[in-house]
């Protein structure tokens, strides 16, 4: 019971943070003094933050419905999913003056997954990584072959991932976790990614580096042949 309460507290805190930022931005808008460009920039920030918060709420709803078996598995283009994530997050990267490099090295493009769940996993990895990139050390989204699996990895340059969190990710997160050494990191996002990975029979893992962490998901490759038209 205590663990459930703790998990709910972490989830509530993460969902409260964007609301607080949105309130601050809204209060800072001065329609009499601000230029049109400044007002448009603030509006765009509000839209970006609200979209990310809504996505987390939607993802939590999906987590609660996983046991209903409503999310079908099918051959999915992992490159298409990654491109979709990059397109949706581009305004968020730009507003933070950050960039995410994409490197697609896999020969296999089709995986067996649910497209919505896979999108959410990669999306959460990328939103975590943007906090730990600079123009000199930009984060990297990569796709590579890994035996009968296809691996999607997001490399960041943040503080070392605590051993306890690394072990929890390895064993499968059972509740949202607070990543105190990585204040920009979303424990709720990692929890969602862990749940979705398990549902799709994919493997979620984290690799610690001296100067950051790579969050990865390995998805079963599809034997179906992809045709280009």
Explain the meaning of each model-derived region:
Residues 67-72, 110-113:
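Conserved micro-motifs of the catalytic ATP-binding
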Residues 45-53:
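Short alpha-helical segment of the dimerization/phosphotransfer core of two-component systems
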Residues 161-175:
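Short conserved segment of the HATPase_c
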Residues 201-202:
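Conserved glycine-rich
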Residues 21-36, 66:
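Conserved C-terminal segment of the DHp
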Residues 92-102:
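Short conserved segments within the C-terminal catalytic ATPase subdomain
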